[in-house]
């Protein structure tokens, strides 16, 4: 009963933040998905069940990282299917790297590449919008490629929604817990985690996540218009439930090991 009361107080305290962050971070998500992700974030269930601030930070950054990779792969597939790949500069590492790899989410290399992916995706989105302005036809192979693109971007949207919830939860836990104490607890289980400089990253994380999800929303909102185009109406994509399960499966390995090692 006490935990329910405590949860209720936390929900009330952070409700305005919750609404803002989820509205920004869930482009392309339906109401049911947004509600599910928001409740998971506030209650600390699902991928955020660990109450350690450091672990919450790490898993949220992993969601950001993998969402970005999904988006990049999806955009490459989209411009390829639409025959406009030569109109944009595609970073080579997007096609070389594994799309779901959360283990290097905090590295400088990964963050640099993620910035490149988002910049490429913005340009690709503009090129796609220009292509959609005029009627066009697609071969069977191109439709298959476009379906793959839509599927990848959709998975990125799911992960982006989860990252938005992670940002909400970060703000809550920073306000109610001692990040330095959590960092020390995490270090006791995994000495490599301990770095005083990480505290600044943790304190800035809620704002950083909000900025990321806002940016992601702008890119994917334009991409979603592909589904409204006459030439692409018959493109098949996987069902939402199947994508949710695939996202869970792909991220579980990347997240669970680190969550366990940081549990204080």
Language model: regions and residue ranges:
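Bacterial N-terminal signal peptides that target proteins for export
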Residues: 2-15
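Immediate post-signal-peptide N-terminus of mature secreted/exported proteins
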Residues: 28-104, 261-264
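C-terminal motif of bacterial Sec signal peptides marking the signal peptidase cleavage site
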Residues: 22-25
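Extended amphipathic alpha-helical interaction segments
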Residues: 110-264
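Generic surface-pattern signal
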Residues: 16, 76, 80, 84, ...
